[in-house]
């Protein structure tokens, strides 16, 4: 869940576009819905557009020439701040293959090769300014119990957290120290 906004979010969405007109129309539509342009340090040569939703949460409208997300649906990626080790952790934790592992950046995608990617941008990592506004929720797959899934996560390097952020979920921290909630079953 969302907490108080303190600086740039460590997780944001990347939306894909199919043409320059689509990128322009998507930006215009999101601005009509209350979005706003935001500067997160992008350069003048960047071809993606960075917006913030009405609550100030950043999202990127990706240019149509971006080949990395070209096979993804409109929600191209959930982009996370994190190390290369974190990408490998999540690949093992959820059983999705690494589809990118270069220059300390990593990404995973469902084994079918379809759907959005989970990406980690590598260093330098953003400063942690209190609680992250957003965090991942995971559910055990394939009829596994939450306790069995938690034991797997702990074996991969996750640690238990005393902090309970979500009702009905087990709180833990991934290998980069990010809050994660393990829910009993997919919702």
List PLM regions with ranges.
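Ordered, small/hydrophobic-rich secondary-structure cores
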Residues: 1-38
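Vicinal oxygen chelate
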Residues: 31-92, 97-129, 140, 150-187
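Short, solvent-exposed beta-strand edge segments and adjacent coil->beta transition regions
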Residues: 8-12, 73-77, 131-135
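Short hydrophobic/aromatic beta-strand micro-patches
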Residues: 14-18, 79-81, 137-141
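Short, solvent-exposed loop/turn segments that connect beta-strands within catalytic domains
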Residues: 6, 21-22, 112-115, 129, ...
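Short, conserved charged micro-motifs
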Residues: 20-26, 85-87, 143-149
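Short, positively charged, low-complexity/disordered linker segments
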Residues: 130-144
């Amino acid at each position: 869940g969302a907490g108080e906004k303190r600086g740039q979010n460590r997780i944001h969405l990347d939306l894909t576009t199919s043409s320059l007109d689509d990128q322009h129309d998507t930006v215009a539509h999101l601005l009509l819905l209350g979005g706003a342009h935001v500067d997160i340090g992008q350069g003048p040569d960047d071809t993606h557009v960075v917006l913030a939703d009405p609550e100030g949460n950043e999202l990127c409208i990706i240019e149509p020439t971006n080949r990395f997300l070209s096979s993804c649906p409109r929600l191209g990626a959930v982009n996370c701040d994190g190390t290369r080790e974190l990408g490998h952790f999540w690949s093992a934790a959820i059983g999705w293959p690494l589809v990118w592992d270069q220059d300390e950046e990593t990404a995973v995608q469902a084994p079918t090769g379809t759907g959005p990617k989970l990406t980690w941008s590598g260093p330098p990592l953003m400063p942690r300014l209190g609680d992250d506004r957003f965090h991942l929720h995971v559910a055990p797959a394939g009829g596994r119990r939450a306790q069995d899934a938690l034991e797997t996560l702990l074996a991969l390097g996750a640690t238990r957290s005393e902090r309970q952020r979500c009702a009905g979920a087990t709180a833990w921290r991934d290998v980069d120290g990010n809050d994660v909630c393990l829910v009993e079953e997919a919702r």
